[in-house]
């Protein structure tokens, strides 16, 4: 479904998932929700929040967008302590099993969510998580406002999250 697919068997490593917490990149839009047992924590595209104390010991999946292959992906992988360019295996990150998924930069659901004609990494990750887990998805740090990045169509993305899933806590 997304470029270098992970195997479905890797996702079976995450058992007893009762909800998914997807972390975006807006620290001012914070629910301060502490991950509880059964929460699968997913950080997408940006690695800054992997060092925020609230999540320091609990990032299970880092989803990267393939379009940033040289400019962003390698430094991001290095920053969170994962081996450079090895994107389909599991690693130990702060005593947690961390799988890194390399996502293709085009969405196969025909949703053109960014002004550049590409789906955002967040929405790709959202669809991917929905495909494998039938649990509520909480978005942390996604405001739905458009000031942060001019290439994102934030209102379209905001609407799509609600249209395609059981989403709560978008501030």
Regions found by a protein language model. Name each.
Residues 1-171:
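Metal-ion/cofactor- or nucleotide/acyl-coenzyme-handling active-site neighborhoods
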């Amino acid at each position: 479904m997304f470029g270098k697919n992970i195997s479905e068997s890797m996702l079976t490593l995450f058992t007893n998932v009762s909800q998914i917490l997807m972390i975006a990149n807006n620290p001012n839009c914070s629910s301060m929700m502490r991950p509880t047992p059964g929460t699968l924590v997913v950080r997408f595209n940006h690695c800054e929040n992997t060092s925020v104390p609230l999540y320091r010991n609990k990032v299970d999946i880092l989803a990267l967008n393939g379009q940033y292959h040289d400019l962003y992906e390698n430094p991001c992988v290095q920053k969170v302590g994962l081996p450079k360019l090895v994107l389909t295996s599991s690693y130990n990150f702060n005593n947690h099993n961390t799988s890194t998924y390399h996502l293709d930069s085009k969405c196969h659901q025909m949703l053109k969510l960014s002004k550049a004609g590409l789906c955002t990494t967040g929405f790709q990750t959202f669809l991917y998580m929905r495909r494998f887990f039938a649990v509520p998805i909480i978005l942390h740090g996604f405001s739905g406002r458009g000031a942060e990045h001019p290439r994102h169509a934030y209102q379209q993305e905001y609407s799509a999250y609600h249209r395609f899933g059981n989403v709560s806590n978008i501030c």
